[in-house]
């Protein structure tokens, strides 16, 4: 029986600090979900239009990484990170003052750009200091800590909205940014030595080389489909849980957070099992759980069981997502040995750009009730399973090497 290789204390400390940075993106998504119906009423617009504030955030999060990745390979990790957090803070404050939809969309776009820079740095720093099994374990540990965001953020956001309104939620995001900025300035070192920095010249050729590498492209597409599933869930959950299942904003935050625990548990399981089973097998197992969970939720809702069927089904699906996410991320990032900032940027851009398509589709389908939304999730789960199987079949040697000693 294999013994799990423990991560050094320095890596654990780095992961904790990086996780606080990585939380900014998910918190910017999850914390204000319960507020969307109230935001639509106050801004005199539709729920679908308010959902655009999530869509533009995701598009900026994806597209912004393409611009930021080469910068971090050229300038190092630390200075761009601090700049990105500062932009995130200012944009959150601006969003809290929005009195019309256009202002909100502009502020959220800027906030997404700031979050994009932070995500590129987080992914790159992990690969700066680790590779192979240790990188996979670090990614899993990172996802475990970051997994607290979908658990806590909706509950905190729901409570803030219930007592102080949605503007307080945006100010809470700004406060989280300030805390992250202080922690990063004090405890996150530069991880890219000057000797390893690269010129931004030929950026398009670098991106083309990475994108055409099947060892990168297949796990990147599978990971993108996984996030598409996640944002399809996020895009419809607020309306379906509150309108169709009768939950209040605060109750929705608690229920949504409870299903988010599954992502946390899945990431923990992935970190513990990766050395024994390898990332390929874990990713296939996780994707199968996603499909099964979504299918169970759909069948239960169709049979009239309502929220009693949907929540357990989604718990299974999101547990599988937590397993698959870290494994696929390690496979994609492990495919490259240089220009890691650009690799992380391209991975994030593909992931977030495709994921952003899920939220307006899910929001539109959820207007028709739970069944169309859950059918959409099941189809997305089928896509995840197909892409993950393709990744595992085409990359058996590469995948196994990440899971071996």
Model-derived features with residue positions:
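Helix-breaking motifs and short loop linkers at transmembrane-helix boundaries and internal kinks
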Residues: 42-44, 76, 97-103, 114, ...
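Helix-loop-helix hairpin linking two adjacent transmembrane segments in secondary transporters
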Residues: 103, 133, 140-186
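Juxtamembrane intracellular "pre-TM" segments in multi-pass secondary transporters
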Residues: 2-7, 189-220
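Conserved MFS/SLC helix-loop-helix module at the cytosolic interface between two early adjacent transmembrane helices
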Residues: 63-102
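A late C-terminal transmembrane helix in Major Facilitator Superfamily
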Residues: 331-367, 377
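Helix-to-loop junctions at the C-terminal end of transmembrane segments
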Residues: 65-76, 266-279, 366
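Paired small-residue
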Residues: 87, 91-94, 102-110, 308-316
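Cytoplasmic helix-loop-helix junction between adjacent transmembrane helices
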Residues: 107-148
């Amino acid at each position: 029986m294999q013994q799990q290789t423990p991560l050094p204390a320095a890596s654990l400390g780095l992961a904790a600090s990086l996780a606080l940075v990585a939380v900014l993106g998910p918190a910017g998504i999850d914390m204000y979900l319960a507020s969307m119906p109230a935001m639509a009423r106050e801004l005199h617009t539709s729920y679908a239009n308010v959902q655009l504030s999530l869509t533009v955030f995701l598009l900026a999060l994806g597209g912004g990484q393409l611009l930021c990745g080469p910068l971090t390979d050229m300038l190092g990790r630390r200075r761009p990170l601090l700049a990105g957090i500062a932009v995130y803070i200012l944009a959150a404050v601006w969003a809290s003052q929005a009195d019309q939809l256009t202002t909100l969309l502009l502020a959220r776009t800027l906030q997404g750009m700031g979050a994009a820079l932070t995500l590129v740095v987080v992914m790159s720093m992990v690969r700066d200091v680790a590779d192979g099994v240790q990188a996979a374990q670090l990614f899993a540990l990172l996802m475990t800590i970051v997994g607290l965001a979908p658990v806590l953020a909706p509950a905190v956001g729901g409570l803030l909205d219930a007592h102080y309104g949605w503007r307080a939620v945006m100010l809470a995001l700004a406060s989280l940014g300030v805390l992250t900025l202080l922690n990063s300035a004090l405890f996150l070192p530069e991880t890219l030595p000057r000797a390893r920095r690269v010129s931004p010249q030929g950026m398009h050729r670098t991106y083309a080389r990475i994108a055409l590498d099947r060892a990168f492209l297949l796990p990147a597409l599978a990971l993108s489909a996984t996030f598409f599933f996640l944002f399809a869930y996020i895009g419809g959950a607020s309306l379906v849980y509150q309108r169709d299942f009768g939950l209040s904003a605060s109750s929705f935050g608690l229920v949504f957070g409870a299903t988010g625990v599954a992502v946390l548990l899945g990431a923990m399981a992935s970190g513990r099992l990766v050395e024994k089973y390898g990332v390929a097998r874990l990713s296939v197992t996780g994707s199968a759980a996603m499909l099964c969970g979504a299918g169970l939720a759909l069948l239960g809702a169709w049979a009239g069981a309502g929220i009693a069927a949907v929540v357990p089904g989604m718990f299974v699906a999101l547990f599988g997502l937590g397993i698959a996410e870290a494994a696929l991320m390690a496979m994609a990032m492990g495919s490259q040995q240089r220009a890691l900032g650009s690799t992380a940027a391209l991975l994030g851009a593909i992931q977030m750009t495709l994921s952003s398509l899920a939220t307006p589709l899910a929001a539109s389908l959820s207007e028709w009730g739970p069944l169309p939304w859950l059918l959409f999730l099941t189809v997305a789960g089928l896509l995840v399973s197909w892409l993950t199987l393709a990744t595992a079949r085409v990359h058996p040697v590469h995948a196994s090497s990440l899971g071996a000693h």
